[in-house]
């Protein structure tokens, strides 16, 4: 017993001495070594079994947040994920995404096919990038034994990825070009998306009107896993400058043509992407209702209601009635055309007083006035992802002589107002209240092939008004 007690005291003394010298006893606990090796292999990132989300929609939403001034990019990005950094538009106004179709077979090679028919003749390709996922290849690396003490820099794979591009036709296929990518990256899931510039390939394909192309992804020294070729799909981002976007009614020609979308055919975004979009849509909506004033005066300020049921609760009109014809009316009034409306809205006294009060407050001169456009009201909400509505504003008001400097009249508008006021020449109208400065609007939508597109449309929001 005394001998055992002495050995115990000796062991405790050595243990305390090691702690004092900064050394740690080597305690082999079961299960920790396997976890440590796994973390070293993956770089502490997510498990390789975790499949990334819909990167195409997520990447396009990131670009929309960037070019529309939104602050939701961090909310959209999922924890532990990292989007490939986009390149600037460089003077362009369009970003198109193309999702790869199911892998096919061409000369016994797996292909990722892309349908580029959405590219228009007016769109000049500035740059194009192919994004593809190799996370499963990177994370299935050779495990570094703990006994060798491998450093972090040595845990790298230098694998050459070969990309062969093909133009696909009905009866034959033609090689478009070869590219290579070096995957000299650490073992982290955040680095498992690779990208390659394919600008010249797509320019050549567009010039030759070859809009169906395929990419074959192979490795020289390693066999790519079959699962990589199936999910997640590669995608292409094309940055372009649309020369026709400044033409009259360009926003209508590029957006209204998607009316062939039927219910249920519009693609659905990933759940976390839809949640990020819903942050903006949950903002309180205000509806401007212009009251009929039964004269030719300028419309008053709009009514804005915070709740949907306020208008019905207040009951500003009594009923929709048909006015009986008066017997004392002259035949001339009775012979008015059938286009004349026989129904008028009967407003209560409280509503009319409020309308008159707002008319008095409303500036009579040329000014910018509020207008909110909801794409659902014009039937475009099915294919427009964001924004669902925007503040367009409009210009209205008088440009009468003498015009103050605040109306910023042009020299021609000043002379025109003087001639009209003097009355030397009859029939001269007063200058018009028109937009002076306007700003662009970024719109994210689905094209006819159900690919996500970002376009920056100019002159969509009125910033200031002037007399011209």
Curated annotation (Swiss-Prot):
InterPro entries: BMP3/BMP3B, Cystine-knot_cytokine, TGF-b_C, TGF-beta-rel, TGFb_CS
Name of one Pfam family that matches: TGF_beta
PROSITE patterns: TGF_BETA_1 (PS00250), TGF_BETA_2 (PS51362)
Known glycosylation sites: 115, 139, 171, 216, 459
Polar residues composition-biased segments: 72-81
Disulfide bonds: 366-433, 395-465, 399-467
UniProt signal peptide: 1-22
GO MF term list: BMP receptor binding; cytokine activity; growth factor activity
SMART domains: TGFB (SM00204)
Alphabetized PANTHER family for the sequence: BONE MORPHOGENETIC PROTEIN 3, TGF-BETA FAMILY
Protein name as it appears in the record: Bone morphogenetic protein 3
